[in-house]
A protein has these predicted regions:
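Surface-exposed binding/hinge segments that line
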Residues: 2, 21, 76, 121-164, ...
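A structural "hinge/loop" feature
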Residues: 32-48, 71-72, 97, 119-120, ...
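Detector for C-terminal structural segments
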Residues: 26, 146, 189-193, 198, ...
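Ligand-site clamp/hinge motif
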Residues: 201-248, 376
Length: 509
């Protein structure tokens, strides 16, 4: 038999896992596929995992959450509000065109124009972006900004080709991304797979070969099929691991469990523009009627800790003196009666399937807890694309609540409170009519431009206390990052939930 024919027969009988290993390929399964390939149009954690492999930012967080150079190799502060950034030379986009200062300027200009992106609130401190010379970008902030360098590493800061930042260009970008990142887009078959291959020319390899040549992202919405796929070796990494299956993965012959405390919190943002949620007492009653510790124990196997003020303890400015609301059904009933709702209120809980582990069960348990004090909670699940549209277009219905697990990508209270709850922030419109007065906004605005860290921390402490009193969201807990993986792949899990394939290694390579 000819050698070529023998080789073909061997290929046909080899198991798929062996072929994947020989080709340095891995498969990652999340419960939902991407909603877009445009980093300016989504901050959803599962979708962001695609962005951070396809694109680069001027600065970047390493896997210990320390800031490092990215597409900018260095920077200097010219004065209190002016920074010059030196761009990395020889970088090319995946379509072969060189990275230019014009691309950087066009990307940042898009982000600072209100309405152009959903990440605008994270960039409003920037006043202007200009080109000093072909290798230097100048950024001038509105006022002294203590967080400018980390803003350039956050969600939405991924640098795009200038031609794809136009109104027509972003439509193309949403379907066929072009970045400078470690992995290039190959194909996207909706509801089936998204494929990337290593960008052999990526500057970050530093002369080394990529450990993984090809990655397939396979959405599997239901928990059980996702677990089975891992156990069979059909996928190498799964996210959103059900807590009650964690031990089985940890003890599996060919699987392991990776965990780390996260920078993300779990809460429900609410549209409190109309009664009854426009009444602070009703919002507080919603919180008192939820047993957060029981949720953590029974739904999440103890993986989490209660939060106060929607701020994670890893964020600069976190105030440990402010405590979470205790579970107090009697207090909840009292507040409802005082507000004139002794017979209860109607509230709808919305969530996108795959937002987080056990999301539907979470909504159902909260609705059950509320029922004990007369709050009638209705559960509405939707596919992730519909959830993203509800979020982006700010169309959570009045007296509706939307499940989220936001994080401050700045690792600072500005990224969690200003970005989301300031009137110019992401959820600002939902707080109309129930704002805690101008004091909260003044505090956050002053802190945003305060260089002295002690003073900024004091401003944040007062703002968090006001927000915790006003309750514009139902605050639950700080998450754990949990992955199930095959033993053929290894990586250090990141607290920021980023699955960066360039940080992974394969056994034997």
């Amino acid at each position: 038999m000819p050698v070529a024919l023998v080789f073909l027969v061997v290929l046909l009988v080899l198991p798929s896992a062996a072929l994947a290993q020989s080709g340095a390929q891995i498969t990652i399964s999340q419960p939902a596929e991407a909603t877009t390939m445009d980093p300016g149009r989504s901050t959803q954690v599962l979708t962001v995992n695609y962005f951070i492999n396809l694109y680069d930012t001027l600065t970047r967080w390493d896997n210990t959450l320390k800031l490092q150079p990215g597409l900018a190799t260095s920077w200097k502060q010219v004065n209190d509000i002016t920074w010059d950034f030196t761009l990395r030379q020889g970088v090319k986009f995946h379509d072969g065109t060189p990275l230019t200062a014009e691309d950087v300027k066009a990307t940042l200009d898009r982000n600072i124009v209100p309405g152009k992106t959903v990440v605008n609130s994270g960039f409003t401190t920037i006043g202007s972006v200009s080109i000093v010379d072909p290798s230097t970008i100048r950024i001038v902030s509105q006022k002294p900004d203590p967080l400018l360098l980390v803003r350039l590493a956050q969600m939405g800061a991924q640098i795009l080709p200038a031609r794809l930042t136009t109104d027509d260009g972003v439509k193309e970008l949403a379907r066929r991304p072009v970045g400078t990142g470690a992995y290039k887009f190959v194909e996207w078959v909706k509801d089936e797979r998204l494929v990337m291959e290593a960008n052999k020319d990526w500057w970050g390899w530093e002369g080394k070969k990529p450990a993984i040549d090809r990655v397939i992202w396979k959405p599997i919405p239901e928990d059980f099929p996702r677990l089975v796929a891992l156990e069979k070796g059909d996928v190498d990494i799964i996210t959103n691991v059900p807590p009650d299956r964690s031990q089985g993965i940890a003890e599996g012959r060919n699987t392991r469990l990776l965990t780390v405390p996260s920078t993300r919190i779990v809460n429900f943002g609410m549209n409190s523009t109309q009664p009854p949620l426009s009444d602070k007492r009703v919002r507080q009653a919603l919180q008192y009627a939820v047993d957060v510790n029981a949720i953590i124990k029974n739904i999440y196997a103890g993986q989490g800790k209660p939060i106060a003020g929607s701020v994670a303890d890893v964020d600069f400015g976190h105030n440990s003196a402010i405590k979470p609301y205790p579970y107090d059904p009697a207090k909840a009933k009292q507040l409802l009666t005082e507000a004139g709702y002794a017979t209860g209120v109607d509230v709808t809980l919305h969530a996108g399937t795959g937002t987080m582990v056990n999301d539907k069960a979470l909504l159902e348990v909260i609705a059950s807890m509320w029922s004990k004090v007369g709050i009638r909670g209705r559960v509405e699940m939707m596919e992730m694309g519909a959830r993203q549209r509800m979020l982006n277009d700010r169309v959570v219905p009045p007296n509706g609540m939307l499940l989220g697990n936001p994080q401050s990508t700045l690792l600072d209270v500005d990224g969690s409170l200003w970005r989301i709850w300031h009137p110019n922030g992401f959820n600002g419109k939902y707080w109309i009519g129930s704002q805690p007065g101008q004091r909260f906004h003044d505090l956050m605005e002053e802190a945003r431009y305060t260089l002295d860290p002690k003073k900024r921390k004091a401003l944040y402490a007062e703002a968090i206390a006001i927000r915790n009193e006003e309750k514009p969201s139902l605050d639950l807990f700080q998450e754990m990052v949990v992955y199930g993986t095959s033993k053929r792949v290894s990586f250090k899990p990141r607290a920021d939930y980023r699955l960066i394939v360039a940080e992974m290694a394969l056994a034997g390579r």
